[in-house]
Amino acid sequence: MNYAKFIDHTLLKPESTRQQIDQIIDEAKEYNFKSICVNPTHVKYAAERLNDSGVLVCTVIGFPLGATTTATKIFETEDAIKNGATEIDMVINIGALKDGRFEDVQKDIEGVVGAANGKTVKVIIETVLLSDEEKVKASELAKAAGADFVKTSTGFAGGGATPEDVKLMKDTVGDELEVKASGGVRSLEDFNKMIDAGATRIGASAGVQIIQGLESDSDY
């Protein structure tokens, strides 16, 4: 198993500097991660630096609250792709989900999927804010809207991925969608728990530590 290809090497802190972006780009090239995930303001620079590297550029839409309008999310998506993004991680309208306005939630996702024009779309449902029933419904809506992944968390809402949530989401979407676990995945042990639960992508700022943990474990 190529562990690095499961990892979206992530830096989404609002205070991220160009120097820090350079660091994760260099690490992504060195370890051959699947992608780097950065805020939209860094996409164009990252895409230029990662050109022909094999490392994808992922960005976030409606992040971290999911509370912007669908039109805004569509514009953000189109702008990100124009700047070189190849994967889109969007946040659902969490309040609409809790209201039971499921059509609004699905249309919001569909808007981003349409704007992405074939690029990979991962739908962040923010599991820490949801009941199990809501997690299932959100996953079903992501599936119905034509997304590629359902994703656990932004990492900004006070909780992250759990193996239990990953399994619930995977059981809901089956083989039609993949599951991305993000938020709090900091070690090889965490990584393995998420993969065992059904995740096929891991969003982590600790990608290097995870891979180094793998390397150190392989010495025994």
Swiss-Prot record:
GO terms for molecular function: deoxyribose-phosphate aldolase activity. Disulfide bonds: none annotated. One of its GO terms (biological process) is carbohydrate catabolic process. Pathway: Carbohydrate degradation; 2-deoxy-D-ribose 1-phosphate degradation; D-glyceraldehyde 3-phosphate and acetaldehyde from 2-deoxy-alpha-D-ribose 1-phosphate: step 2/2. Its EC number is 4.1.2.4. InterPro entries: Aldolase_TIM, DeoC, DeoC/FbaB/LacD_aldolase, DeoC_typeI. Keywords: Cytoplasm, Lyase, Schiff base. Belongs to the DeoC/FbaB aldolase family. DeoC type 1 subfamily. Gene3D superfamilies: Aldolase class I. It is found in: Cytoplasm. SMART domains: DeoC. It catalyses: 2-deoxy-D-ribose 5-phosphate = D-glyceraldehyde 3-phosphate + acetaldehyde. One of its GO terms (cellular component) is cytoplasm. It holds the Pfam family DeoC. This is Deoxyribose-phosphate aldolase. The active site is at D89 (proton donor/acceptor), K151 (schiff-base intermediate with acetaldehyde), K180 (proton donor/acceptor). Catalyzes a reversible aldol reaction between acetaldehyde and D-glyceraldehyde 3-phosphate to generate 2-deoxy-D-ribose 5-phosphate.
